[in-house]
Amino acid sequence: MNCSRNDVVLLPIPFSDLTSHKVRPAIVVGHAPDPRDLFVVPIPSRLQQATFPLRDWKACGLNVPSAVKGQLATVESRLIRRVTGHLGKADATQLDHHLRRWLGLQD
């Protein structure tokens, strides 16, 4: 599926024991060197598991208040089930700030 940066997507996330999976939302933050892969950041609905809450979660196509988890994953783009929405400007700016901090790219 064709996705862009800051798209909110649904994709299967495996359980830690790898016996099953559940479809969960994530934010596309970039394309990996392999064109079949994407970098994503998970969106948990449990706010206590997250780094910062999404201000405009409804525009992201989410059903409940949600947040961004400080975790980066690489996924195959073929696993994307659908695009549900797109981050608003304020949420995208906050995500960019946190990505730079998580990756040690701040001046």
What annotation goes with each model-predicted range?
Residues 1-107:
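Conserved functional hotspots at enzyme active or ligand-binding sites that engage polyanionic ligands
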